[in-house]
């Protein structure tokens, strides 16, 4: 009975934000439809492109599941960081920062997320996929963070399940850098999608890249769904970013790192630097 009550409470908490997201998708579709109508009436060639609605049954299911994933996530601010199983995406051996390859022609070595953590340095963990526009649009900003703060922190990009697979809840191609990736059928598909992302966006060599396993254990443990960023320090969650896409904020990560860097000169308690913006 207690478990049923907890599930009901979580559902009631989710409903208002779920409906607000549905309203946003409806408004978005209306604006895009109006734009297509204007272009059609003006006989513009741009109107000939395919119009993809965002407010669909598949979209509603994905949005609802994303809120459930966030509500039931294992990770909590100040709590132990889940040591999820992941697949390491190895760099190429030709010395090029932008060259990546899979080991044995398939996937890299299986390891764990905290294998990349150093007890003396914070680990910034950035979760996302190629078909998530808010994530890919922030990759250049993430690269700058890596370049600027790699002297005091480590960085890890975790490639997860596609947010908008082309054979699922597909997003409209809003920019030339948009990706079309199908649902991952196996680990090789997921690693290949990660390679495709890294071929398009050259990440600094200081940033390690891994892919979530096909059981999506990292995605579930950290409640990612679309995108999320967190900071692990001494095996604990020192910063927990909000649920993407609306509360995915790298600027707050920059602020945390600036505070953390200052802490080296003027020691403060870890609690003073901890921030939680998750909903």
Curated annotation (Swiss-Prot):
Location in the cell reads: Endoplasmic reticulum membrane
Q: Name one GO cellular component term.
A: endoplasmic reticulum membrane
Which terms are listed as keywords in the entry?
Answer: Endoplasmic reticulum, Membrane, Oxidoreductase, Selenocysteine, Thyroid hormones biosynthesis, Transmembrane, Transmembrane helix
Instruction: Write the Enzyme Commission number(s) for this entry.
Output: 1.21.99.4
Described function: Plays a crucial role in the metabolism of thyroid hormones (TH) and has specific roles in TH activation and inactivation by deiodination. Catalyzes the deiodination of L-thyroxine (T4) to 3,5,3'-triiodothyronine (T3) and 3,3',5'-triiodothyronine (rT3) to 3,3'-diiodothyronine (3,3'-T2) via outer-ring deiodination (ORD). Catalyzes the deiodination of 3',5'-diiodothyronine (3',5'-T2) to 3'-monoiodothyronine (3'-T1) via ORD. Catalyzes the phenolic ring deiodinations of 3,3',5'-triiodothyronamine and 3',5'- diiodothyronamine.
What binding partners and quaternary form does the record give? Predominantly monomer. Can form homodimers but homodimerization is not essential for enzyme activity.
This protein is called what?
Type II iodothyronine deiodinase
State the species of origin.
Answer: Gallus gallus
